[in-house]
Amino acid sequence: MAEANPKARVNLERAVTLLLDDNPEGISILVQIVTAFGIKSLHRCTSIEAAQEVAGQYELDLIVANANMRDSSGYDFVSWLRRVNLEPNSFTPAIILTGHTQVSNVRKARDCGANFIVAKPVSPSVLLERILWVARESRPFVACDTYVGPDRRYKDMGPPEGMEGRRREDKLAKAATPAPAAEESGEVPEAQAKAVQ
Protein backbone atom coordinates (compact mmCIF):
# COMPACT_ATOMS: atom_id res chain seq x y z
CA MET A 1 0.00 0.00 0.00
CA ALA A 2 1.29 3.45 -0.82
CA GLU A 3 2.20 5.62 2.10
CA ALA A 4 0.32 8.82 2.74
CA ASN A 5 1.92 11.64 0.80
CA PRO A 6 3.36 14.06 3.39
CA LYS A 7 2.80 16.97 0.97
CA ALA A 8 -0.82 16.08 0.22
CA ARG A 9 -3.35 18.52 1.60
CA VAL A 10 -6.42 17.03 3.17
CA ASN A 11 -8.85 19.09 5.20
CA LEU A 12 -10.31 16.97 8.00
CA GLU A 13 -11.23 20.02 10.05
CA ARG A 14 -14.97 19.47 9.65
CA ALA A 15 -14.90 15.68 10.03
CA VAL A 16 -17.08 14.80 13.02
CA THR A 17 -15.29 11.87 14.64
CA LEU A 18 -16.28 9.38 17.32
CA LEU A 19 -13.45 7.75 19.27
CA LEU A 20 -14.38 4.68 21.33
CA ASP A 21 -11.93 3.27 23.89
CA ASP A 22 -12.41 2.52 27.57
CA ASN A 23 -8.70 3.01 28.28
CA PRO A 24 -7.92 6.65 29.26
CA GLU A 25 -4.37 6.43 27.89
CA GLY A 26 -5.60 4.83 24.67
CA ILE A 27 -8.20 7.50 24.02
CA SER A 28 -5.70 10.23 24.89
CA ILE A 29 -3.28 8.89 22.26
CA LEU A 30 -6.10 8.70 19.69
CA VAL A 31 -7.12 12.29 20.44
CA GLN A 32 -3.53 13.47 19.90
CA ILE A 33 -3.26 11.57 16.61
CA VAL A 34 -6.55 12.71 15.07
CA THR A 35 -6.20 16.32 16.23
CA ALA A 36 -2.78 16.33 14.52
CA PHE A 37 -4.68 15.40 11.33
CA GLY A 38 -6.74 18.58 11.80
CA ILE A 39 -9.90 16.96 13.16
CA LYS A 40 -11.57 19.38 15.56
CA SER A 41 -14.98 17.90 16.26
CA LEU A 42 -14.37 14.89 18.52
CA HIS A 43 -16.67 12.76 20.61
CA ARG A 44 -14.68 10.73 23.14
CA CYS A 45 -16.61 7.70 24.35
CA THR A 46 -15.46 5.23 26.99
CA SER A 47 -18.40 2.82 26.64
CA ILE A 48 -20.67 1.45 23.95
CA GLU A 49 -23.64 3.07 25.67
CA ALA A 50 -21.99 6.51 25.41
CA ALA A 51 -21.07 5.85 21.77
CA GLN A 52 -24.65 4.79 20.98
CA GLU A 53 -25.94 8.00 22.55
CA VAL A 54 -23.53 10.12 20.48
CA ALA A 55 -24.48 8.22 17.30
CA GLY A 56 -28.12 8.97 18.02
CA GLN A 57 -27.51 12.71 18.47
CA TYR A 58 -24.83 13.70 15.95
CA GLU A 59 -24.11 13.04 12.29
CA LEU A 60 -20.73 11.31 12.20
CA ASP A 61 -18.08 11.26 9.48
CA LEU A 62 -15.63 8.77 11.01
CA ILE A 63 -15.54 6.18 13.79
CA VAL A 64 -12.35 4.82 15.34
CA ALA A 65 -13.09 2.08 17.89
CA ASN A 66 -10.92 -0.12 20.09
CA ALA A 67 -11.70 -3.77 19.41
CA ASN A 68 -11.42 -5.06 22.96
CA MET A 69 -12.72 -3.27 26.01
CA ARG A 70 -13.52 -4.51 29.51
CA ASP A 71 -17.28 -4.94 29.17
CA SER A 72 -17.79 -4.89 25.42
CA SER A 73 -15.99 -4.38 22.13
CA GLY A 74 -15.68 -2.04 19.20
CA TYR A 75 -16.91 -4.96 17.08
CA ASP A 76 -20.20 -4.89 18.99
CA PHE A 77 -20.61 -1.15 18.51
CA VAL A 78 -19.92 -1.24 14.76
CA SER A 79 -22.25 -4.22 14.32
CA TRP A 80 -24.98 -2.39 16.27
CA LEU A 81 -24.48 0.80 14.25
CA ARG A 82 -24.68 -1.04 10.93
CA ARG A 83 -27.95 -2.76 11.88
CA VAL A 84 -29.79 0.09 13.60
CA ASN A 85 -31.69 2.54 11.43
CA LEU A 86 -29.63 5.68 12.13
CA GLU A 87 -29.06 7.09 8.67
CA PRO A 88 -26.56 8.41 7.71
CA ASN A 89 -24.55 7.12 10.70
CA SER A 90 -25.24 3.49 9.83
CA PHE A 91 -23.03 4.07 6.76
CA THR A 92 -20.25 5.98 8.54
CA PRO A 93 -16.75 4.62 7.87
CA ALA A 94 -15.51 2.63 10.87
CA ILE A 95 -11.93 1.66 11.69
CA ILE A 96 -11.27 -0.98 14.36
CA LEU A 97 -8.02 -0.86 16.37
CA THR A 98 -6.65 -4.04 17.89
CA GLY A 99 -3.48 -5.31 19.51
CA HIS A 100 -4.33 -8.84 18.40
CA THR A 101 -4.37 -9.33 14.64
CA GLN A 102 -5.02 -13.04 14.44
CA VAL A 103 -7.12 -14.14 11.49
CA SER A 104 -10.12 -14.61 13.80
CA ASN A 105 -10.00 -10.93 14.85
CA VAL A 106 -9.58 -9.72 11.28
CA ARG A 107 -12.63 -11.81 10.30
CA LYS A 108 -14.55 -10.44 13.28
CA ALA A 109 -13.78 -6.86 12.17
CA ARG A 110 -14.78 -7.64 8.59
CA ASP A 111 -17.96 -9.41 9.66
CA CYS A 112 -19.10 -6.65 12.03
CA GLY A 113 -19.07 -4.19 9.12
CA ALA A 114 -15.84 -2.29 9.79
CA ASN A 115 -14.08 -0.69 6.85
CA PHE A 116 -10.59 -1.43 8.19
CA ILE A 117 -8.71 -3.03 11.04
CA VAL A 118 -5.50 -1.33 12.22
CA ALA A 119 -2.93 -3.02 14.44
CA LYS A 120 -1.78 -1.44 17.68
CA PRO A 121 0.40 0.31 18.54
CA VAL A 122 -1.25 2.78 16.19
CA SER A 123 1.05 4.53 13.78
CA PRO A 124 -0.30 7.97 12.81
CA SER A 125 0.80 7.47 9.19
CA VAL A 126 -0.99 4.10 8.92
CA LEU A 127 -4.17 5.51 10.49
CA LEU A 128 -4.08 8.48 8.10
CA GLU A 129 -3.59 6.11 5.14
CA ARG A 130 -6.68 4.16 6.17
CA ILE A 131 -8.73 7.32 6.68
CA LEU A 132 -7.72 8.56 3.21
CA TRP A 133 -8.41 5.14 1.70
CA VAL A 134 -11.90 5.10 3.20
CA ALA A 135 -12.50 8.64 1.93
CA ARG A 136 -11.54 7.61 -1.63
CA GLU A 137 -13.11 4.17 -1.83
CA SER A 138 -16.52 3.58 -3.27
CA ARG A 139 -17.37 0.09 -2.10
CA PRO A 140 -21.13 -0.41 -2.15
CA PHE A 141 -22.94 -1.11 1.09
CA VAL A 142 -24.47 -4.56 1.51
CA ALA A 143 -27.43 -5.37 3.74
CA CYS A 144 -28.67 -8.93 4.16
CA ASP A 145 -29.75 -11.23 7.00
CA THR A 146 -26.23 -12.11 8.09
CA TYR A 147 -24.20 -9.00 7.22
CA VAL A 148 -24.54 -5.24 6.99
CA GLY A 149 -21.58 -3.14 5.93
CA PRO A 150 -19.24 -2.30 3.08
CA ASP A 151 -18.95 -4.95 0.37
CA ARG A 152 -16.44 -7.49 1.68
CA ARG A 153 -15.31 -8.61 -1.77
CA TYR A 154 -12.09 -6.71 -1.44
CA LYS A 155 -9.33 -8.64 -3.19
CA ASP A 156 -10.76 -8.42 -6.69
CA MET A 157 -11.44 -4.71 -6.49
CA GLY A 158 -7.84 -3.56 -6.02
CA PRO A 159 -6.92 -0.38 -4.22
CA PRO A 160 -8.76 2.89 -4.85
CA GLU A 161 -7.70 4.89 -7.90
CA GLY A 162 -4.43 6.73 -7.41
CA MET A 163 -3.10 4.34 -4.75
CA GLU A 164 -0.57 1.65 -5.49
CA GLY A 165 -0.72 -1.63 -3.70
CA ARG A 166 -0.11 -5.32 -3.70
CA ARG A 167 -3.68 -6.11 -4.67
CA ARG A 168 -3.34 -4.58 -8.15
CA GLU A 169 -0.38 -6.87 -8.89
CA ASP A 170 -2.31 -9.83 -7.50
CA LYS A 171 -5.19 -9.01 -9.82
CA LEU A 172 -2.88 -8.92 -12.86
CA ALA A 173 -1.24 -12.19 -11.83
CA LYS A 174 -4.65 -13.79 -11.39
CA ALA A 175 -5.64 -12.70 -14.91
CA ALA A 176 -2.46 -14.30 -16.28
CA THR A 177 -3.09 -17.62 -14.48
CA PRO A 178 -5.03 -20.13 -16.60
CA ALA A 179 -8.33 -21.36 -15.23
CA PRO A 180 -8.40 -25.12 -14.46
CA ALA A 181 -11.00 -25.83 -17.15
CA ALA A 182 -8.97 -23.95 -19.76
CA GLU A 183 -5.82 -25.92 -18.91
CA GLU A 184 -7.62 -29.21 -19.51
CA SER A 185 -9.21 -28.14 -22.79
CA GLY A 186 -6.14 -26.31 -24.09
CA GLU A 187 -8.15 -23.12 -24.58
CA VAL A 188 -6.73 -19.82 -23.40
CA PRO A 189 -9.28 -17.37 -21.98
CA GLU A 190 -9.43 -14.03 -23.79
CA ALA A 191 -8.38 -12.07 -20.66
CA GLN A 192 -5.31 -14.27 -20.27
CA ALA A 193 -4.40 -13.91 -23.93
CA LYS A 194 -4.54 -10.11 -23.61
CA ALA A 195 -2.49 -10.18 -20.38
CA VAL A 196 0.23 -12.30 -22.02
CA GLN A 197 0.53 -10.13 -25.17
List the predicted regions and their residue ranges.
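CheY-like receiver
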Residues: 10, 136-197
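A short, hydrophobic beta-strand element within the central beta-sheet of small alpha/beta folds
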Residues: 18, 88-101
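Two-component/phosphorelay signaling modules centered on CheY-like receiver
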Residues: 24-48
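Alpha4 helix (beta4-alpha4-beta5 surface) of REC/receiver domains from two-component response regulators
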Residues: 31-32, 76, 101-116, 142, ...
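Acidic, metal-coordinating helix/loop segments flanking the phosphotransfer/catalytic sites
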Residues: 44-62, 66
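Active-site residues of response regulator receiver
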Residues: 66-68, 98
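Short amphipathic alpha-helix used as the core "switch/output" element in two-component signaling
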Residues: 68, 73-89
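C-terminal output helix
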Residues: 122-131, 135, 139, 143-144
